Amino acid sequence: MTTPNDFQTRTDRIEVAEVELRRHIDKVVEGLRAKDLDALKQLYTTDVVSFDVEPPLQHVGIAAKLENWAKVFMLFESVAYEVRDLTFTVGDDVAFGHAFARLSGTLKNGATTGGMWVRVTYGMRKIDDTWLIAHDQVSVPLDIASGKGVVDLEP
């Protein structure tokens, strides 16, 4: 039996996948802004490995990833999150992407924070026809001389 996908070229499939991947990251942004852990849970593999800017060196599994976001949400009354310059390289069932991202908002104590721009890398897997984040890494540049992260750069 022939399906519509049988007639798609590889280029067409990659273009469709890139649209799906961008929508997926848009859902991450929406979930963060809404502080919706249930929505975020649907966007990651159960065995996600996350290298985030705060300790420990890695967060392994969806529970650890969500616990990390829950800690952030406890600090913020309202969350703003933006992604810039998102780029993907797409295969049939694996893709990777990179972008700049910034978390900002109003803290529970009423103070506002402009946040800091970070570099983010996504490792994506297509499982049962759905793209999921299997790995993410968030980082800031390091000033070698001082040994401190540089957090005042902008894209």
How would you describe each model-predicted region?
Residues M1-D47, F88, V150-P155:
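Short, low-complexity N-terminal intrinsically disordered segments enriched in polar/charged residues
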Residues V28, L40-K41, V48, G61, ...:
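Hydrophobic pocket/interface hotspot
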Residues M1-T3, W117-K148:
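Short beta-strand edge/turn micro-motifs at domain boundaries
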Residues Y44, A101-L103, Q137-V140:
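Short beta-strand segments enriched in hydrophobic/aromatic residues
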Residues E20, V49, A64-N109:
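Surface-exposed, charged secondary-structure patches
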Residues T2-R10, V16, L75, H98, ...:
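C-terminal-biased regions
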